[in-house]
């Protein structure tokens, strides 16, 4: 066995923008990533050992530049044609197909006359005959075609990357750089042919100058667009667009589905089509702008990444921003993610990175990945043996028919019976999960009415009316304040009395009880004691019931507004109305340091000046609302009066309308002589109106014919039709 190759050193990565012209790495560069014809032929010979003796002169690789022949000639059948149609018809003949097989098998070719003679005598197997012969011949042709493709295709050596260029410097180091950042492509350049001398010098010059100075990068995919203009490493400008054009759970754009003839007519499909058109317009307007158009014209390198279906964004239509065949235009030779500005920066950084190897990377790849040579040989004997398998199996099955009887006789002779028991075993794999999976439970949202009922039930909760669930949660302990002082029967009675007074708003009884607090030490602890498992205090009950005076009295007596119930709610948040909440704010203004009001969730103090301003603002709002309502009422009356006058005028005859018009003209003349304040009723009745519908013509340009005036052409046409005159 050959010893394993030594581990190669990892290549060093250097940015092209960090290299200067006099860098040691760039001294004595020469281009080594081209393939002469001799190297190509040698690679073909070494790819298949022993193939030199098998390959006929006709199948040897063509020496010279590869191009498409324009001659009307078939090299297989040695036939000359008059036109392309005759040449295409020849390729469909059995004679041409037979000669192709003969050529692939290295057998002599037949002329047209010999082929007709042998086919008429039956010496040749029919190319399109029975199914067996046809399938065999087609399989042979396919296998030989694969062998020919393996032998004749220009296999490139290991370690060669078509999008990169390999250089070697004076120190013997190998430099790998991406071709797209080393200037425009040459017209006669080819991937596997010799690089022209002019392009070789251009590549060396661009590498030594530090890569592209002006570069435009454009990416578009799935409704996303990203573009940037780079000057060296610096970003001059960039722009991104995003439109919803991809169909849900499909990953394809809407336009691609429409192009297949399955256009959807839903609202979502229409929205996606609109977004496609909007994205097309936005990108075209951006690239047609002065800054981007100038950058595309002066850039030395243009990098593009777009799917085949989305390239019309850059090449289609009139005044396309990019031109096909532009030598500066390159496809991005990297796998890219979603088009974003960060992805553009990553692509430019990746493409402008120079990889420096200590050894030839092609040799390293060849040693690391040895080539495996495969031979595809079809043997008729193997097929014949496989065809005999069914008959052999039938014979074996016939011989085995007696086996069960013999086995049963032997078992009967031995007297031993074998019992088989079928056991079903269930294997659980839930314990192998990394995380526990629980079904997601949806919380039902309660409406305002349910929340209000909860507050009322909390306010009316007493010790004797606690639900049975509270008994289960609190154990066997009675629903009493968790205080030692409240264990006596007198304390329980006092608690019930205070709670009933808070709910009913009995301020007098509370004053009598609270004024005796210095004499009765059991009253003061009950003010802030929670009520059972619900956690309601006396202050909670009074606030939920909307008793503002009771809340003020309890706060002045020493009730703590920071005590929370079982749902972590202070008394301020359960207040029934604004007036009750204002009592907490007034107490905060008088006693700012008494409690932690942030814990009590009281927003701020309420001073007398603030209340005065609020009262003034409410009065102004009320006056404005009354004035607005009065204006609306007057407007409605005017509209009603105008509608009645319009209906009355429309019901008049033409004679009466002429009389009213004469009176209106006379009144206008008298008003000009004696100007007075007009009466609103007279003004409404004497204003000019449409002769057909009676609509007021004030502020409108009327339509006239003869002595009649109309508000619209429709009324004019209706009046003419009624008068029996033509409308033209």
From Swiss-Prot:
Active site residues according to the UniProt entry: 254
Coiled-coil annotated residue ranges, if any: 608-659
Ranges annotated as biased composition (Acidic residues): 131-140
Purpose: Endonuclease that cleaves polypeptidyl-tRNAs downstream of the ribosome-associated quality control (RQC) pathway to release incompletely synthesized polypeptides for degradation. The RQC pathway disassembles aberrantly stalled translation complexes to recycle or degrade the constituent parts. ANKZF1 acts downstream disassembly of stalled ribosomes and specifically cleaves off the terminal 3'-CCA nucleotides universal to all tRNAs from polypeptidyl-tRNAs, releasing (1) ubiquitinated polypeptides from 60S ribosomal subunit for degradation and (2) cleaved tRNAs.
Domain of life: Eukaryota
Domain annotation VLRF1: ranges: 211-354
Residue list for modification Phosphoserine: 266, 533
Annotated region described as Disordered, given as residue ranges: 120-140, 359-416, 442-487, 589-656
Biased composition (Basic and acidic residues): 380-391, 610-656
Ranges of compositional bias, category Low complexity: 120-130
Domain notes: The VLRF1 domain mediates binding to the 60S ribosomal subunit.
Taxonomic classification: Eukaryota, Metazoa, Chordata, Craniata, Vertebrata
GO biological process: cellular response to hydrogen peroxide; ERAD pathway; protein quality control for misfolded or incompletely synthesized proteins; rescue of stalled ribosome
Family the entry assigns: Belongs to the ANKZF1/VMS1 family.
Chain positions of all zinc fingers (C2H2-type): 72-96
Region named VCP/p97-interacting motif (VIM): 654-666
Quaternary organization: Interacts (via VIM motif) with VCP.
Gene name for this UniProt entry: ANKZF1
Modified residues (Phosphothreonine): 607
Protein name per the record: tRNA endonuclease ANKZF1
ANK repeats: 493-526, 534-563
InterPro entries to which the protein is assigned, alphabetical: Ankyrin_rpt, Ankyrin_rpt-contain_sf, ANKZ1/VMS1, VATC, VLRF1/Vms1, Znf_C2H2_type
């Amino acid at each position: 066995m050959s010893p394993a190759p030594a581990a190669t050193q990892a290549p060093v990565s250097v940015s092209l923008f960090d290299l200067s012209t006099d860098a040691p790495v760039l001294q004595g560069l020469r281009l080594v990533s081209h393939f002469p014809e001799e190297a190509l032929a040698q690679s073909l010979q070494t790819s298949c050992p022993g193939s030199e003796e098998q390959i006929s002169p006709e199948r040897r690789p063509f020496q010279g530049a590869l191009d498409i022949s324009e001659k009307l000639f078939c090299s297989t059948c040695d036939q000359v044609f008059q036109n392309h149609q005759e040449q295409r018809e020849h390729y469909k003949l059995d004679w041409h197909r037979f000669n192709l097989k003969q050529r692939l098998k290295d057998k002599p070719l037949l002329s047209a006359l010999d082929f007709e003679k042998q086919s008429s005598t039956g010496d040749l197997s029919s190319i399109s005959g029975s199914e067996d012969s046809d399938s065999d011949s087609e399989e042979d042709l396919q296998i030989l075609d694969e062998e020919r493709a393996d032998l004749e295709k220009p296999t490139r050596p290991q370690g060669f990357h078509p999008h990169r260029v390999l250089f070697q410097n004076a120190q013997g180091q190998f430099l790998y750089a991406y071709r797209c950042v080393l200037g425009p492509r040459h017209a006669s350049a080819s991937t596997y042919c010799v690089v022209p001398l002019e392009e070789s010098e251009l590549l060396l010059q661009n590498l030594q100058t530090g890569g592209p100075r002006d570069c435009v990068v454009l990416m578009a995919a799935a409704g996303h667009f990203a573009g940037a203009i780079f000057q060296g490493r610096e970003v001059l400008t960039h722009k991104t667009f995003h439109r919803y054009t991809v169909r849900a759970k499909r990953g394809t754009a809407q336009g691609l589905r429409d192009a297949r003839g399955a256009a959807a007519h839903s609202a979502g499909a229409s929205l996606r089509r609109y977004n496609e058109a909007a994205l097309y317009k936005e990108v075209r307007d951006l690239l047609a702008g002065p800054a981007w158009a100038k950058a595309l014209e002066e850039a030395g390198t243009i990098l593009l990444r777009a799917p085949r279906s989305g390239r019309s964004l850059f090449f289609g239509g009139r005044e396309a921003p990019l031109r096909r065949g532009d030598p500066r235009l390159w496809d991005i030779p990297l796998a890219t993610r979603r088009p974003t500005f960060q992805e553009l920066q990553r692509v430019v950084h990746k493409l402008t990175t120079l990889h420096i190897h200590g050894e030839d990377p092609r040799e390293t790849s060849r040693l690391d990945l040895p080539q495996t040579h495969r031979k595809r040989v079809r043997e008729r004997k193997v097929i014949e043996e496989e065809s005999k398998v069914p008959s052999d199996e039938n014979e074996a099955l016939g011989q085995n028919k007696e086996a069960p009887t013999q086995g049963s006789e032997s078992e009967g002779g031995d007297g031993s019976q074998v019992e088989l028991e079928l056991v079903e075993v269930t294997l659980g794999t839930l314990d192998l999960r990394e995380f526990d999976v629980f079904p997601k439970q949806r919380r039902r949202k309660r409406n305002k009415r349910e929340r209000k009922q909860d507050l009322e039930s909390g306010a009316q909760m007493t010790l004797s009316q606690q639900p049975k669930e509270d008994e289960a949660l609190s154990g066997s302990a009675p629903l009493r304040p968790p205080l030692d002082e409240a264990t006596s029967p007198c304390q329980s009675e006092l608690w019930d009395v205070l709670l009933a007074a808070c709910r009913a708003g009995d301020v007098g009884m509370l004053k009598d009880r609270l004024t005796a607090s210095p004499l009765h030490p059991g009253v003061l602890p009950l003010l802030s004691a929670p009520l059972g498992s619900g956690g309601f205090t006396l202050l909670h009950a009074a606030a939920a019931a909307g008793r503002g005076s009771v809340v003020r009295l309890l706060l002045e007596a020493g009730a703590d507004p920071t005590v929370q119930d079982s749902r972590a709610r202070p008394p301020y948040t359960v207040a029934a109305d604004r007036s009750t909440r204002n009592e907490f704010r007034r107490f905060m203004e008088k006693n700012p340091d008494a409690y932690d009001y942030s814990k009590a969730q009281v927003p701020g103090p309420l001073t007398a000046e603030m209340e005065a301003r609020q009262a003034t603002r409410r009065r102004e709002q009320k006056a404005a609302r009354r004035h607005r309502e009065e204006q609306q009422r007057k407007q409605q009356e005017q509209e009603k009066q105008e509608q009645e006058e319009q209906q009355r005028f429309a019901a008049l005859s033409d004679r009466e309308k002429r009389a009213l018009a004469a009176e209106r003209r006379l009144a206008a003349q008298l008003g000009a002589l004696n100007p007075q304040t007009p009466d609103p009723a007279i003004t409404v009745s004497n204003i000019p109106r449409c002769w057909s519908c009676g609509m007021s013509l004030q502020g409108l340009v009327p339509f006239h014919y003869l002595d009649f005036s109309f508000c619209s052409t429709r009324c004019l046409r209706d009046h003419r039709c009624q008068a029996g005159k033509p409308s033209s």
